[in-house]
C-alpha cells in the first residue's frame, strides 16, 4: 500500500470517528410554518400542570361529576401485542410486545406512565378550567375484561364521557388481529363554544420505557419528533440543565416519541393546527421524559367534531413503518439523506430482506453480504492492485528522479508526472476502492446500530449482533477502548494487518512500515464499541480481501509496463559571479 493510500485510509478513519461521535446529521428546515419555533426554554408550561394530589372536583368545573368513579381495565390480545385500556381517561396503560423482549429476554411494558396512562385529550374551558381526560371516568358497553383478536378479525371498544345532554366526548379504539396499528377515533359533541381558543390537543405523555442494558446508548437514540412539510422536526432533551420545548403551527403527518428500537406515534387522517413537543431529563434519572401532542381546531360554527387517527406503538422496523405510508420510517437515523440513507434504504436493507427469505441466520447473511460487496468491487480492486504493483516497479526510477531534482521542485513534479503518464498509473489509484466503499461502511454502521432485525440475533459467540460482542467485561472503562474486550474487532485487526502485509506497496520508509502496525490498532480501538454485526462484516470483508489480493498478486504482473524515457541528468548549475570582482 503506497503512502497516499495509507494517508487516505487514516484521514477517512479519522473523519469517520469525528463524524459519528460529534457530527449528527442536520435535518432540513421546516416548510410552511406559520409561527417561529420556541426551543431550549428554561421554563416550560407542561401540557397538564395540575398535580393529581392537588386536583379537586372544583378544578374540573362542569366535568367535576366525572372526576370520581370506578376504573375498569380491558386487556386486548392480538398476534403482536397485549394492550391494556382503562376507563379512567379512556387511555392506554400498558403495551407489551410479544415478539420483542427487553435486554433480559423478558416481556416488558413500553408505557412509562403506566399508572395514569399515556394518551389523553387536553384543553381549556371558557371558564379557565384545565381538562386532562386522564382525570375523568368514561363509561363503556364492553363487559369483558379480556379480548383476543384473531388474525383476520377486528375488535372495537368505545368509551363515552357524558358531560351534559347533547354534550359528550366519545373515544373508540379499533384493534386488528395482525397489525401493530390501532385505530383511534375522537368525537366531541356540543363543545363548539365551550373550548378556549377552539383548540384541543391529543397528547402522548412520558415517552417510552428503555429496553436496552446500555442506558447511555438508549439516551443517545431517544428523542421526540414531528413530520411537517416533508421535513423532520426533532427534539432531543439530552442536557439535564435544560427543559426543551418545540411548538409549531401547520399540518403534521405524525408526531412520535422513540427509544433506540421502539416508537409511539400518533398519525392523523386530516389537517392539524400544529404540534407540541417537550422533553426533560431529570437529574439522576437514566431516561428522558417526552411529551408529544397534535393540535386540532374545533369549528365554532359546528356542533360536533370528529377525527380519526392511527396509533403505532411498536418496533422501529423499516418495512413495517414504511408500509404505513406516512413516512414514519424517517424516524430512523440512517445518517445524511444525500449520502448514507440511500445506501441503507435501497441497498443494504433490501439485500438483507432478500437473503433473509432463504437464510434465517443474520451472521451468515452478513458474511454473504461482505462477499457480494467484494465481488462487486473486484474490478476496482484489481485495477488498484495492478496500479500499486506498477508503482512498486517504478520506485527505483522515482527515487533517482527525486535525488536528481531535489533542488528543483517544479522539474521534479514534471518528471514524476511524465513517468506516471508513460507508465499508465495513477498515484491515487490505491485510494479509490476505499473511498467508494466508505459511504457503504457508514451506512452499515447506522443500519447495524439502529436496525431491530439484528437485535437479539446471535452468531457464534456473539449473543446480539446489534451490540459489541464482549467476551470480557472490565467493570471500568479504559480511555479510547471501552469497558470490555470484543473479539470480532481483534480478529478484524489481525486481518487488516495481514491484508496490508501482502498488499503491494510503493513505499519502504520507516513511516510506512509503522503504519502497517498503527492502522490495525486504530481500527481495533474504533470497532471495539461498535455493533458485533459491523465487526463481523469488516472482519469478513478483510478476509475476502486477503484472498483476493493473494490471487491478484499471483496472476498480475508488471510485464506490460511500457518502455520509459531515460532520466535526463540535471544540468550542472553555473557558478555565480562574485560581485565587484577585479578585472584581470
UniProtKB/Swiss-Prot annotation:
Where this protein primarily resides, as one coarse class? membrane
Keywords in UniProt for this one?
A: Cell inner membrane, Cell membrane, Chaperone, Membrane, Protein transport, Transmembrane, Transmembrane helix, Transport
Is the keyword Protein transport assigned to this protein?
Answer: yes
Q: Does the keyword Protein transport apply?
A: yes
The cysteines joined by S-S bonds are: none
Q: Where is the composition biased (Basic residues)?
A: 574-584
According to its UniProt entry, one GO biological process term is: protein insertion into membrane
Region Disordered, residue ranges: 563-584
Q: How does this chain sit within the bilayer?
A: Multi-pass membrane protein
Name the InterPro entries for this protein.
Answer: Membr_insert_YidC (IPR019998), Membr_insert_YidC_N (IPR028053), YidC/ALB3/OXA1/COX18 (IPR001708), YidC/Oxa/ALB_C (IPR028055), YidC_ALB_C (IPR047196), YidC_periplasmic_sf (IPR038221)
What does the record give as the function of this protein? Required for the insertion and/or proper folding and/or complex formation of integral membrane proteins into the membrane. Involved in integration of membrane proteins that insert both dependently and independently of the Sec translocase complex, as well as at least some lipoproteins. Aids folding of multispanning membrane proteins.
Family membership: Belongs to the OXA1/ALB3/YidC family. Type 1 subfamily.
Describe its assembly.
Interacts with the Sec translocase complex via SecD. Specifically interacts with transmembrane segments of nascent integral membrane proteins during membrane integration.
This one is known as: Membrane protein insertase YidC
Organism listed in the record: Prosthecochloris aestuarii (strain DSM 271 / SK 413)
Lineage of origin: Bacteria, Pseudomonadati, Chlorobiota, Chlorobiia, Chlorobiales
Report which gene this protein is encoded by: yidC
Amino acid at each position: 500500500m503506497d503512502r497516499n493510500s495509507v494517508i487516505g485510509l487514516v484521514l477517512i478513519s479519522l473523519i469517520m470517528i469525528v463524524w459519528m461521535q460529534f457530527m449528527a446529521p442536520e435535518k432540513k428546515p421546516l416548510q410552511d410554518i406559520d409561527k417561529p419555533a420556541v426551543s431550549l426554554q428554561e421554563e416550560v408550561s407542561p401540557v397538564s400542570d395540575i398535580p393529581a394530589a392537588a386536583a379537586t372536583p372544583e378544578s374540573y368545573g362542569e366535568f367535576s361529576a366525572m372526576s370520581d368513579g370506578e376504573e375498569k381495565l380491558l386487556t386486548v390480545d392480538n398476534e403482536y401485542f397485549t394492550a391494556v385500556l382503562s376507563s379512567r381517561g379512556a387511555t392506554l396503560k400498558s403495551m407489551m410486545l410479544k415478539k420483542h423482549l427487553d435486554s433480559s429476554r423478558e416481556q416488558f411494558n413500553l408505557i412509562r406512565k403506566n399508572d395514569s396512562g399515556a394518551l389523553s385529550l387536553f384543553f381549556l374551558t371558557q371558564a379557565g378550567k384545565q381538562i386532562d381526560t386522564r382525570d375523568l371516568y368514561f363509561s363503556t358497553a364492553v363487559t369483558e375484561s379480556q379480548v383476543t383478536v384473531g388474525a383476520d378479525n377486528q375488535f372495537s371498544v368505545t368509551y363515552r364521557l357524558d358531560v351534559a345532554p347533547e354534550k359528550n366526548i366519545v373515544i373508540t379504539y379499533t384493534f386488528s388481529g395482525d397489525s401493530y396499528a390501532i385505530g383511534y377515533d375522537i368525537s366531541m359533541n356540543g363543545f363548539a363554544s365551550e373550548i378556549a381558543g377552539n383548540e384541543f390537543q391529543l397528547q402522548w405523555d412520558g415517552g417510552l420505557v428503555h429496553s436496552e442494558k446500555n442506558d447511555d446508548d438508549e439516551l443517545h437514540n431517544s428523542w421526540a419528533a414531528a413530520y411537517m412539510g416533508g421535513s423532520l422536526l426533532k427534539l432531543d432533551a439530552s442536557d439535564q440543565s435544560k427543559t426543551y420545548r418545540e411548538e409549531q403551527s401547520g399540518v403534521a403527518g405524525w408526531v412520535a416519541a422513540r427509544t433506540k428500537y421502539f416508537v409511539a406515534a400518533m398519525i392523523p387522517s386530516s389537517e392539524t393546527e400544529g404540534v407540541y413537543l417537550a422533553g426533560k431529563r431529570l437529574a439522576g434519572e437514566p431516561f428522558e421524559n417526552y411529551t408529544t401532542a397534535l393540535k386540532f381546531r374545533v369549528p365554532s360554527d359546528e356542533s360536533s367534531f370528529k377525527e380519526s387517527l392511527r396509533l403505532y406503538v411498536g418496533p422501529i422496523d423499516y418495512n413495517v413503518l414504511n408500509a404505513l405510508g406516512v413516512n414514519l420510517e424517517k424516524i430512523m437515523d440512517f445518517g445524511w439523506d444525500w449520502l448514507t440513507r440511500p445506501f441503507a434504504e435501497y441497498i443494504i436493507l433490501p439485500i438483507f430482506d432478500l437473503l433473509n427469505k432463504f437464510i434465517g441466520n443474520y451472521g451468515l447473511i452478513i458474511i454473504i453480504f461482505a462477499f457480494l460487496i467484494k465481488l462487486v468491487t473486484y474490478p476496482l480492486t484489481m485495477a488498484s492492485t495492478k496500479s500499486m504493483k506498477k508503482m512498486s516497479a517504478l520506485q527505483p526510477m522515482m527515487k533517482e528522479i527525486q535525488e536528481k531534482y531535489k533542488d528543483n521542485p517544479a522539474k521534479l513534479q514534471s518528471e514524476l508526472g511524465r513517468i506516471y503518464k508513460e507508465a499508465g498509473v495513477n498515484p491515487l489509484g490505491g485510494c479509490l476502492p476505499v473511498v467508494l466503499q466508505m459511504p457503504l461502511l457508514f451506512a452499515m454502521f447506522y443500519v447495524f446500530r439502529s436496525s431491530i432485525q439484528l437485535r437479539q440475533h446471535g452468531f457464534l459467540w456473539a449473543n446480539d449482533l446489534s451490540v459489541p460482542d464482549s467476551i470480557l467485561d472490565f467493570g471500568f472503562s479504559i480511555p479510547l477502548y471501552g469497558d470490555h474486550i470484543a473479539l470480532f474487532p481483534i480478529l478484524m485487526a489481525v486481518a487488516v494487518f495481514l491484508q496490508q502485509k501482502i498488499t503491494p506497496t510503493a513505499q519502504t520508509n520507516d513511516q510506512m512500515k509503522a503504519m502497517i502496525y498503527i492502522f490495525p490498532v486504530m481500527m481495533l480501538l474504533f470497532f471495539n464499541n461498535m455493533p458485533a454485526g459491523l465487526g463481523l462484516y469488516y472482519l469478513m470483508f478483510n478476509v475476502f480481501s486477503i484472498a483476493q489480493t493473494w490471487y491478484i498478486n499471483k496472476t498480475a504482473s508488471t510485464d506490460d509496463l511500457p518502455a520509459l524515457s531515460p532520466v535526463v541528468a540535471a544540468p550542472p548549475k553555473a557558478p555565480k559571479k562574485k560581485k565587484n570582482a577585479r578585472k584581470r
